[in-house]
Each structure stands twice: as C-alpha cells, then as structure tokens.
Amino acid sequence: EADRAHPQKKSRPLAAGIVSTQVAWLAAVLLPTLALAAAYSLHQGLFWVLLLYFVLQVAYSFSLKHIVLLDILVVAAGFVLRVLAGGVVIEVQLSPWLYTSAGLLALFLVIGKRRQEFSTLGEAAASVRRVYAHYNLALLDDMLRIVTTSTLITYILYTVEARTMVRNGENLGLLTVPIVIYGLLRYLYLIHVRKEGSAPDEILLTDRPLQATITVTALAYFVIIYLL
C-alpha cells in the first residue's frame, strides 16, 4: 500500500497490480532458493554470504525498514555483503578499508536518496515510509555530512594501504583521490541544487559527469595495476 502512494514506486509491477500477490510470494520463495542452490554449487562460502544477505533482506522487508537509523544501515550492510561475496568467489582477502569504504559509500547514497525523497514528499513522506515520521531534513543533512567525510577518509586509507598501487616507492592510488572527491561533491550538488537523488541508479545512468568520474577511476585503476 505504501508503494502505491509513492510517486515512483507506484509503477512497480506489484504496486500497479500487474503481478498478483500469489505470484510475488512464489517468486520470493523460488528465486532465492535457486540462487542459494547455485551459490552452494559454486562456492560454499558464497552460499553462507548469500544466505545472510537474504535473511537480512527479509528482516528489512518485515521489520527493520520501520526502525529509525537501522533502515539505512541495513541497506548499506547489504552492499558490503555483495563486496564480500565477490571476494569469496575470487578467493581474495580484500582490505578491511575496502569493505568500510563500500559500506560508507552505500550509506552516502542511501542517505542522499532518503533526504531527497523526504524533501520532495514533504508532509506525505510518513505515509510512504512509516519511518520518515522519525526523520527531519536537519538530521538527514547532518548524517550526510558525517558520512561524506567518513567515506573520503576511509577511501584515502584504502589507497594508502593498497600495495598493488605502489610503483617505484610511490603510491599511485592517491592520484584517484581527487576524482573520488569530485564524484562525491557532484552527487551532493545533484541532491541540493538540482533536487535529484531519489533514484541513485537513474542518476548514474543519466548524469554524464558522474559517468565520466566512474569511467576515469576505473581506467586509472586498470592502468596502475596492469600497465605500470
């Protein structure tokens, strides 16, 4: 019902009545079961990570999304588990700072989305997300400032620790820091000035400067690790 009141989510298949509740429940049981079976056949470690991810998503859907602060922390934790799953599959021990950076970046995007959604919906926000009754713009802005700073600091620590980025005694990974700073500031600009941000995935698909930021960062890593 809450999705039907949301200006964007109301077009989702279940909210729009395109998919019945029975079909949705069947898919909710069948698809995770198939995914877990495939994960177990690929790597037992991946199975346990994926199982934890599904448990977290179920807990979020039925309870945690209504608890202030936990509603955003759980979403960010889901992204960390995805990074962990990647590390498990390729059997590489990833840096703790990478997990921290990924989690904080996810938190940055989630808070930005919540902030823009809350600002756009106004008094109707609580009818779309019950938890919005416990938020206000001042709190969301303070959280966004803290997480933005923390994201940048942990990313710098990750690049400093990354030995794969060191060439001739110089840590070339630090060259990517200005690019990341620009990306974070660009996203804040889109939230506060352009009043976008309610759908981070759409922004990443439509905003050319952000696309360029991601592309340049990926190319920088490729060149430093594989060509230098």
Predicted features along the sequence, with ranges:
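Internal transmembrane alpha-helices of multipass membrane proteins
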Residues: V49-S61
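Hydrophobic alpha-helical membrane segments of integral membrane proteins
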Residues: W48-L52, H66-A76, W97
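C-terminal membrane-associated helical module and adjoining short loops/tails
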Residues: F62, V80-L228
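Acidic (Asp/Glu-rich) catalytic motifs at the cytosolic membrane interface
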Residues: E1-A15, L70, I111-S119, R186
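Residue-level recognition of pore/gate-forming positions within transmembrane alpha-helices
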Residues: L31-T33, F54-Q57, V75, F79
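Multi-pass membrane catalytic core of lipid/isoprenoid biosynthesis enzymes
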Residues: R4-L50, P96-L107, D142-T148, R208-I225
